[in-house]
Amino acid sequence: MQRYFRFGALMMLCLLSFLIFADGEAAGKIKAEDFSYQNISLGDSEEALRARWGEPDVQNEQVIWGIHLKTFTYGDIVVSTSATGGKVVDINLIGEKYHLRKDVHYGATSSYLLKVYGKAERQFLDGHTCYVFSHPDHVRERLILNLDAENSALASARITMLPLTDEEADEMALSDDESFVELDLKHSFIASKEIDVSDLPKNDNVKLGGYVK
């Protein structure tokens, strides 16, 4: 009888350990849903943005890493689309009102961020200490969590498919990955290197590197 009791207790302990481990794994993992905000995702069209969020408070244009962008400001949120493709390429969450998955919000502690999104090394980008997480299926899509310099709590968040450094911009420009077509990186790369393309053929089937079939 004692043998059956011990066996049952052992099985219960194993099951409890598995459930605790599974819950920890589920809590500390980046997910595809982390790369959208209020029904707007990277790659959505400008038309979809206006349909879901309405007209912006402010509309402007800017250039980042040679990429021409249109920016739409909704309160403390700035959404950028590629001027070439018209697709959402950057969602910048500033201010103190945003809320992400599992109630991640302004002022959330670093330990809680790692509990929700998993382990990450701190990096320094654009003057901020931050955590950078890549999309589980699209590594060039990133969630950037900027930390407060004094207490390392969450200050702002950014969902982006833009390059993070000049070197990365050049690498993406020379890539054959068609997912970068919205950014018109090849055109930007040529312009930034001051390459004279005036004598190149104007055929639509011409690409950097040769013709396509």
Model-found features: residue ranges?
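Second-shell loop/turn segments in exported
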Residues: 33-39, 96-104
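Sec-dependent signal peptide cleavage junction
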Residues: 20-28
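Bacterial N-terminal signal peptides
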Residues: 9-19
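A cross-family detector of function-defining hotspots
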Residues: 27, 34, 44-84, 105-213
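Bacterial N-terminal signal peptides that target proteins for export
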Residues: 1-10
